[in-house]
Amino acid sequence: MGRFIFVSFGLLVVFLSLSGTEAGFCCPLGWSSYDEHCYQVFQQKINWEDAEKFCTQQHRGSHLVSFHSSEEVDFVVSKTSPILKHDFVWMGLSNVWNECAKEWSDGTKLDYKAWSGQSDCITSKTTDNQWLSMDCSSKRYVVCKFQA
């Protein structure tokens, strides 16, 4: 009986220690987790509008990737660079110059910036922390993101 109580107490301690960490959430199969969000790289090139629509169909709450720190960009680059090599992925920003966008397509605040040009839609390089403007009708790879 004493051994059972000891083992039960030990399991309770382990459970409680994990409950305050990110162990409480997990991303669906094929998605990668970072800072309580899930990300997936898709190896197909489509225009910005179709890319945003595609992301919203992948998972509830999913949109084109939004960035809120250089560390988050580094995480996404670690996922895109090995798969897509030297290319570009759509980000959840469009009509930035025409409408002075202040938020991402997922509704979060535009609180981190790394501009490198002007146009309607914004891409991120798959190999480093640079954003470039491109014609929204051009075809680029897709990274989707949602809050876990």
UniProtKB/Swiss-Prot annotation:
Signal sequence, renumbered to the chain: 1-23
Full protein name: Snaclec mucrocetin subunit beta
InterPro entries named among the record's database cross-references: C-type_lectin-like (IPR001304), C-type_lectin-like/link_sf (IPR016186), C-type_lectin/snaclec_domain (IPR050111), C-type_lectin_CS (IPR018378), CTDL_fold (IPR016187)
Compartment(s): Secreted
Purpose: Platelet-agglutinating factor that acts in a vWF-independent manner. Binds specifically to platelet GPIbalpha (GP1BA) to a distinct binding site from that of flavocetin-A.
C-type lectin domain mapped to chain residues: 34-145
Keyword Transmembrane (UniProt): no
Family: Belongs to the snaclec family.
Keywords assigned by UniProt, alphabetized: Disulfide bond, Hemostasis impairing toxin, Platelet aggregation activating toxin, Secreted, Signal, Toxin
Organ and tissue specificity: Expressed by the venom gland.
GO molecular function annotations of the record: toxin activity
Disulphide-bridged cysteine pairs: C27-C38, C55-C144, C121-C136
Organism: Protobothrops mucrosquamatus
A Pfam family that the UniProt record links to this protein: Lectin_C
Recorded superkingdom: Eukaryota
